[in-house]
Amino acid sequence: MILFPAIDLKDGQCVRLKLGDMEQATVYNSDPAAQARAFEEQGFEWLHVVDLNGAFAGETVNGDAVDAILRATKNPVQLGGGIRTLDHIENWLARGLKRVILGTVAVRDPALVIEACRKFPGRIAVGIDAKGGKVAVEGWAEASELGVIELARRFEGAGVAAIIYTDIDRDGILTGINWAATLELSDAVSIPVIASGGLASLDDIRRMTEPEAQKLEGAISGRALYDGRIDPKEALDLIREARKGMIR
């Protein structure tokens, strides 16, 4: 069970969006590497990074910022946004990423995801971003008719390390995680699920530690951390206590 702090990159800066709208970006830190170090010093064990410009462009745009993050932290880093080819995946893993997140390509070319899992075992996650229960692609700019569970089940047995499920309708507005949809997905597949979008308070962290949610790998937090709505120490203490209970 992991709480992943998020760094979303736009034009080289650490930002948060509301509902995935690039025009509603709030800059929280102009130095993403410093933010990565701060999260590590606060006790977080992983880092979730998204190249927002890259998600729209279909290729890496904020590569220099990601490289700076990788140099700044010893924590494992997972990256999504604009990664669409095997060469691109291999390049990023060689540069120090622990895990690559594939979103649009999981819809457009699922065979590539399966091949990536074979070639890079344990290093590939699938990002499923949903609006109204349907999968969105190309930086959330395009809607599909594909259902979340339908897409997730395509990768059963492929070796996907995790599914990162984001409810776009809740992203960045602090309304709480969509637990009904997240747990429905977690129950429908054997792949570990990471909840994203809307995490608002310690109540969401507590919910994540309840027995019904213990199939989850964890949750991603952005605005709630940046705005001080969640105290890192309190959140991490809750998770550590829950882990002890699971071990027992």
Swiss-Prot record:
- Provide the top EC class: isomerase
Q: Pathway involvement?
A: Amino-acid biosynthesis; L-histidine biosynthesis; L-histidine from 5-phospho-alpha-D-ribose 1-diphosphate: step 4/9
Q: What is its EC number?
A: 5.3.1.16
The lineage, from the top, is: Bacteria, Pseudomonadati, Pseudomonadota, Alphaproteobacteria, Hyphomicrobiales
HAMAP family for this protein: HisA
An MF annotation (GO) of this entry: 1-(5-phosphoribosyl)-5-[(5-phosphoribosylamino)methylideneamino]imidazole-4-carboxamide isomerase activity
The family note in this entry says: Belongs to the HisA/HisF family.
Q: Which Pfam families match?
A: His_biosynth
The entry's cellular-component GO terms read: cytoplasm
Q: Where is the active site?
A: 8 (proton acceptor), 129 (proton donor)
Q: Which organism is it from?
A: Sinorhizobium medicae (strain WSM419) (Ensifer medicae)
Where in the cell? Cytoplasm
What InterPro entries is this protein classified in? Aldolase_TIM (IPR013785), His_biosynth (IPR006062), HisA_bact_arch (IPR006063), Isoase_HisA-like (IPR044524), Isoase_HisA-like_bact (IPR023016), RibuloseP-bd_barrel (IPR011060)
Q: Which gene encodes it?
A: hisA
- The principal localisation class reads cytoplasm
- Please identify the protein, giving its name as recorded: 1-(5-phosphoribosyl)-5-[(5-phosphoribosylamino)methylideneamino] imidazole-4-carboxamide isomerase
One annotated GO biological process? L-histidine biosynthetic process
| Alphabetically ordered keywords of this record | Amino-acid biosynthesis, Cytoplasm, Histidine biosynthesis, Isomerase
Which reactions fall under this protein's catalytic activity? 1-(5-phospho-beta-D-ribosyl)-5-[(5-phospho-beta-D-ribosylamino)methylideneamino]imidazole-4-carboxamide = 5-[(5-phospho-1-deoxy-D-ribulos-1-ylimino)methylamino]-1-(5-phospho-beta-D-ribosyl)imidazole-4-carboxamide
Q: Which domain of life is it from?
A: Bacteria
